[in-house]
């Protein structure tokens, strides 16, 4: 299939680029190997912030008297529920990204994208062409011998 633009990676850089290109009248596809929204939205930034919010609320409850409040009973964190809430937040946001892609007529291609030539991409055995390919795959930390993490 031929597109004007194919974006590889659906994180904050990728899905925003795809949406903007579509809004400008381009035929766009977005390739993602996992859930829409990428690592940041599904496993990094967003779930971490949800976990931190639970810790913040717990801290507020523990210091309720400083705010003129008396809580009846003990405030106890439930790790399973805290993690479930974090996963739920990430899932909701991922579905939101998928909705925005659909709303903007962007083809979401699930799979691992691999450049094969200029303007050509292969995703799990299927070949695609585009006038432009945007690589928005993010990064992974890498340990170097002279600078261990």
Language-model features: locations:
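Beta1/beta-strand and adjacent pyrophosphate-binding region of the FAD-binding site
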Residues: 1-13
């Amino acid at each position: 299939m031929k597109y004007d633009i194919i974006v590889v990676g659906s994180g904050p850089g990728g899905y925003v680029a795809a949406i903007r290109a579509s809004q400008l009248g381009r035929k766009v596809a977005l390739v993602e190997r996992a859930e829409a929204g990428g690592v940041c939205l599904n496993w990094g930034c967003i779930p971490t912030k949800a976990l931190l919010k639970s810790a913040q609320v717990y801290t507020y409850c523990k210091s309720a008297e400083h705010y003129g409040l008396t809580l009846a009973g003990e405030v106890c964190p439930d790790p399973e529920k805290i993690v479930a809430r974090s996963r739920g937040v990430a899932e909701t946001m991922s579905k939101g990204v998928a909705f925005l892609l659909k709303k903007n007529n962007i083809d979401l291609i699930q799979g691992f994208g691999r450049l094969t030539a200029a303007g050509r991409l292969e995703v799990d055995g299927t070949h695609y062409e585009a006038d432009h390919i945007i690589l928005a795959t993010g990064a992974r930390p890498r340990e170097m011998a002279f600078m261990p993490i």
